[in-house]
């Protein structure tokens, strides 16, 4: 069992055993019913990528390539236009959160572009990688007031470097997420930001270090308990999957493509489970 599988099972069991139920929840299922959830607060885990600890479960198939395409839509294309996500990358699931004008509102990629977030981050890391102010923050109240739209779930990422005894510089990343659907989105979000960490490390010819993941509200929706129990019972794959970025050191952040990523030794347990999303 991988480290990620162990953490996944522990989190599921913790929510089932110790979680509490939400009240007056905002999300709805497709039939209009309120999507309440059972949740715990303050979930934190460290993945040492140097040791091959990647945050991807083998207990069910996870669409990592689609997740990376979504990440590039946000941080490379820097847009919230659904047509770009759907036509350029073939990713269509964000349509559920459209606001009627072909976008998801002044959110995510549109926020990245408005404040030149990636440009400022790369510039800051280039000038002084040891600066403790190298931060991405998508939580912008001005944007929330400008349009409707889903507020960012994974909203803040902090980057730090450290020089190890081997003389190499390692890039660490800390992802802070306000809310996370444990069964559906947990490993998608985590692997997206590991991919972002890898892209930035390649840009500067650094090594990838540790990935710290904090979720404020970690939940299982009230129509997912059967799937949760199934996942706890499953026997994990004996493989140790890892994500590889096949580009030379020093490759420009904006020149990296989805196909440059390779998921190695990923043999998840099947069949896939079905989930009705809360919107």
From Swiss-Prot:
UniProt keyword Protein biosynthesis, yes or no: no
UniProt main location, coarse: cytoplasm
The organism's place on the tree of life at top rank: Bacteria
Compartment(s): Cytoplasm
GO cellular component: cytosol
Catalysed reaction, written as an equation: dUMP + (6R)-5,10-methylene-5,6,7,8-tetrahydrofolate = 7,8-dihydrofolate + dTMP
Keywords in alphabetical order: Cytoplasm, Methyltransferase, Nucleotide biosynthesis, Transferase
Binding site for dUMP: 132-133, 178-181, 189, 219-221
Pathway the protein acts in: Pyrimidine metabolism; dTTP biosynthesis
GO biological process, one term: dTMP biosynthetic process
Enzyme class: transferase
Active site: 153
Binding site for (6R)-5,10-methylene-5,6,7,8-tetrahydrofolate: 181, 278
Pfam families tied to this protein: Thymidylat_synt
PROSITE patterns on file: THYMIDYLATE_SYNTHASE (PS00091)
EC number: 2.1.1.45
Record carries keyword Metal-binding: no
Role played: Catalyzes the reductive methylation of 2'-deoxyuridine-5'-monophosphate (dUMP) to 2'-deoxythymidine-5'-monophosphate (dTMP) while utilizing 5,10-methylenetetrahydrofolate (mTHF) as the methyl donor and reductant in the reaction, yielding dihydrofolate (DHF) as a by-product. This enzymatic reaction provides an intracellular de novo source of dTMP, an essential precursor for DNA biosynthesis.
HAMAP family assigned to the protein according to its UniProt record, in alphabetical order: Thymidy_synth_bact
Family to which the UniProt record says this protein belongs: Belongs to the thymidylate synthase family. Bacterial-type ThyA subfamily.
Assembly notes: Homodimer.
Name this polypeptide is given: Thymidylate synthase
Organism field: Lactococcus lactis subsp. lactis (strain IL1403)
Lineage: Bacteria, Bacillati, Bacillota, Bacilli, Lactobacillales
Gene: thyA
